């Protein structure tokens, strides 16, 4: 993902696990820079990044299958520490001369691990002879070890639950330390990167700010730059970074695509012109966007249409400015991860993000993406570093495609106005209840379903509004927010009474996974 090798990088090779992103989060929390790469491009990434250590992820594959993914031999030839997690442990063993078999007792869920030997991996956390909760998810298991390895931890169904070659600094764990269900897992990963790899905790937002500003200057040179400003945290932080880097070479452009929240465009313009002194152009392109989306119900096509129109508008505005060479976007690391297929097939791509996979292949400007390596919570920390107020940094995430993906089916002005009003009421109720900061993201969805209702003495046949609220740390996984039912009742009553076009309100209790946070 990065074009520059950081001096202290951990490379995470993804074999297709659903929780690989959590490994990266735990490593970043230890103030160490890391990158996730799919196994197919691991050789290239290893040469480019020159990592100090490598972590091998879990996988739905079996090492006993012909053609199953393997780690590059180069990592074992490099003499650097390696940690294999679940499948990562198994493929490391298989590649180094051990044996892995299928068909043994499987372990899924909570298990208890017995520590057989002390190790730098356990230092300050677990001691020999103690037992600890871990989270297992495996069908295969190691049955014999490569030369140099010893068993340092066991569980009832995994006699090789933790293995180590202390001399070469190779470690394997059959459980998943990256998930919260392994209570000491984050500390184990910290031990690996700090004690075993020897990387110091130098990954901070202050350091990132300096590196990002320098990288922007190097990429842009004396070229003209425009920034795709939406008013959200991501694009705002990207704009401030770019402005710090290139000053008057930057012009910010806010496209009002008609898909923003209530009064949002005007609020954004006032804030940036008055408080940040950034050159800002407001473009009303609502007719163009809504017209293109009215007959489009496929969510992927909606995202790609929005991405295409964004670029068209920006290119037109750039021409009015006398030409621009670069376009700044607030693309985040989860956007990039979710837009990459890690097994080479389209079925693995969760959704195209309008500012990654949704962009047209032919662009007349080069992309500048200074936040491409950051998770959402890191962007907020960077925003604080740049001086943005807490009230702004703490705003809930809002997707680039806006209300278009909260309005399943074709998009019309009428539907958008109904949704905008319902969403504003819902967020107002959340703020009045003092819940806004406890929730990662909350919003209303206008369903393409109408139901019968009764208002006064008359029959109604109007839309259904779904309310969504989730808790999360980084947007990669999320749980629905557990409201008090009185709150939901009050919010539903206000929406039905105050918004014409809605006669029924429901609440979404789906977590991520299996669902995504947004409906489309």
UniProtKB/Swiss-Prot annotation:
Residue ranges of every copy of the GMPS ATP-PPase domain listed in the record:
203-395
Enzyme Commission no: 6.3.5.2
**Would the keyword Electron transport be found if you checked this record's keyword annotation?**
no
Task: List the PROSITE patterns hit by this protein, alphabetically.
Answer: GATASE_TYPE_1 (PS51273), GMPS_ATP_PPASE (PS51553)
GO molecular function per UniProt: ATP binding; GMP synthase activity
In which domain of life is the source organism classified? Bacteria
Binding annotation for ATP: 230-236
Q: What is this protein called?
A: GMP synthase [glutamine-hydrolyzing]
Gene3D superfamilies given for it? 3.30.300.10, 3.40.50.880, HUPs
Q: Which UniProt keywords apply?
A: ATP-binding, Glutamine amidotransferase, GMP biosynthesis, Ligase, Nucleotide-binding, Purine biosynthesis
Q: Which residues form the active site?
A: 86, 176, 178
Task: Name the enzyme group at the top EC level.
Answer: ligase
Look up the record and name the pathway of this protein. Purine metabolism; GMP biosynthesis; GMP from XMP (L-Gln route): step 1/1
Q: What does this protein do?
A: Catalyzes the synthesis of GMP from XMP.
Looking at the record, the residues that make up the Glutamine amidotransferase type-1 domain are 9-202
List the record's Gene Ontology CC terms alphabetically.
Answer: cytosol
- Subunit structure, interactors included: Homodimer.
> What's the catalysed reaction?
XMP + L-glutamine + ATP + H2O = GMP + L-glutamate + AMP + diphosphate + 2 H(+)
């Amino acid at each position: 993902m990065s074009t520059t090798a950081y001096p202290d990088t951990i490379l995470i090779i993804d074999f297709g696990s659903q929780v690989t992103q959590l490994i990266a989060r735990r490593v970043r929390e230890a103030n160490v820079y890391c990158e996730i790469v799919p196994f197919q491009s691991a050789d290239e990434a290893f040469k480019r990044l020159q990592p100090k250590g490598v972590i091998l992820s879990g996988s739905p594959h079996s090492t006993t299958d012909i053609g199953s993914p393997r780690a590059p031999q180069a990592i074992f030839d490099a003499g650097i520490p390696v940690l294999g997690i679940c499948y990562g442990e198994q493929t490391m063993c298989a590649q180094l001369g051990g044996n892995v078999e299928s068909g043994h007792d499987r372990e899924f869920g909570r298990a208890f691990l017995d520590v057989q030997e002390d190790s730098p991996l356990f230092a300050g956390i677990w001691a020999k002879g103690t037992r600890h909760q871990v989270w297992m998810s495996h069908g295969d298991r190691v049955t014999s070890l490569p030369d140099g390895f010893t068993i340092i931890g066991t569980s009832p169904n995994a006699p090789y639950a933790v293995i180590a070659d202390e001399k070469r600094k190779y470690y394997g764990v059959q459980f998943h330390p990256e998930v919260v269900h392994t209570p000491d897992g984050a500390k184990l990963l910290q031990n690996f990167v700090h004690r075993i790899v020897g990387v110091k905790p130098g990954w901070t937002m202050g350091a990132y700010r300096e590196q990002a500003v320098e990288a922007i200057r190097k990429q842009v040179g004396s070229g003209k730059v425009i920034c795709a400003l939406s008013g959200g945290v991501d694009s705002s932080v990207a704009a401030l970074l770019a402005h710090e880097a290139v000053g008057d070479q930057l012009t910010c452009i806010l496209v009002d695509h008609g898909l923003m929240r209530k009064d949002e465009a005007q609020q954004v313009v006032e804030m940036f012109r008055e408080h940040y002194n950034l050159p800002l152009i407001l473009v009303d392109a609502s007719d163009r966007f809504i017209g293109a989306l009215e007959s489009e119900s496929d969510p992927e096509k909606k995202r790609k249409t929005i991405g295409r129109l964004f670029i068209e508008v920006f290119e037109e505005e750039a021409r009015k400015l006398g030409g621009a060479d670069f376009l700044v976007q607030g693309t985040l690391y989860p956007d990039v991860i979710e837009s990459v297929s890690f097994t080479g097939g389209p079925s693995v791509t969760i959704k195209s993000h309008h500012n990654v996979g949704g962009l047209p292949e032919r662009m007349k400007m080069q992309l500048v993406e200074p936040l491409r390596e950051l998770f959402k919570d890191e962007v907020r920390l960077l925003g604080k570093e740049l001086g943005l107020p807490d009230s702004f940094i703490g705003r809930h995430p809002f997707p680039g495609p806006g209300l278009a993906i909260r309005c399943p089916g074709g998009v019309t002005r009428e539907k958008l106005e109904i949704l905008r009003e319902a969403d504003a009421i819902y967020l107002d109720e959340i703020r009045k209840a003092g819940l806004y900061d406890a929730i990662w993201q909350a919003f209303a969805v206008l369903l393409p379903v109408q139901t019968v209702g009764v208002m006064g003495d008359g029959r109604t046949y109007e839309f259904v509004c779904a309310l969504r609220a989730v808790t999360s740390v980084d947007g990669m996984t999320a749980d629905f927010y557990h409201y008090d039912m009185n709150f939901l009742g009050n919010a539903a009553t206000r929406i039905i009474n105050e918004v014409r076009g809605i006669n029924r309100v429901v609440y979404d209790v789906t977590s991520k996974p299996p669902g995504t946070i947004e409906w489309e």
